[in-house]
Amino acid sequence: MILITGANGQLGTELRYLLDERDEDYVATDVSQLDITDADQVDKVFSEVKPTLVFHCAAYTAVDKAEDEGKALDYAINVTGTENIAKATATHGATLVYISSDYVFDGEKTVGETWSEDEQTNPQTEYGRTKVIAEQKIQETLKHFYLIRTSWLFGKYGKNFVSTMLDLADKKEKIEVVNDQHGCPTWSR
């Protein structure tokens, strides 16, 4: 059985459709079914579902808000919630696929340069810091796991840069965007 956290988010939604196409058995949870910050609730869901594979897509992704008014929620979801998922994964003998972010790096590479998975992390934002701490909690808790660092996630579902630009193109004659950022878009499909 597969368990998905954050199943109504951009990546979780795409994952559900993909698993449906493959006729896989899964349980999809979102915050209304599973508060990942509540360790007892997490353990209860794991006991009921008995997953062998967990896609942990749930996250606090309001990067700008994480710097101030969302700081506590960012930590609770991205660190405490992820630690709860990792502990339950270990207890129940499942395999974890954790969705992290390129925000764990400092963004100092130039166009054309890429990061590798073994490079030193150096987050410059609160959001990035919580993702690094979450990765560390997973590494401390589990021997085997998959860690995926996405960048500029886009797809058919949810709000993202591509959908925002398409909406703006319908509403405005001229669109202005920043030109000092670069990244590697990750298709959610």
What are these regions (language model features)?
Residues 5, 29, 54-58, 96-101, ...:
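SDR active-site strand-loop-helix element
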Residues 39-77:
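NAD(P)H-binding glycine-rich loop region in Rossmannoid oxidoreductase-like domains
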Residues 54, 68-97:
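NAD(P)-cofactor binding segment of oxidoreductase domains
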Residues 20-44:
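Adenosine-cofactor binding site in Rossmann-like domains, unifying the SAM/SAH pocket
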Residues 136-188:
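NAD(P)-dependent short-chain dehydrogenase/reductase
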Residues 64-72, 107-112, 158-159:
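Conserved catalytic-core motifs of eukaryotic protein kinase domains, centered on the activation segment
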Residues 1-21:
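N-terminal Rossmann NAD(P)H-binding glycine-rich loop of SDR-like oxidoreductase domains
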Residues 76, 80-84, 104-148, 152-153:
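Catalytic helix-loop patch of NAD(P)-dependent Rossmann-fold dehydrogenases
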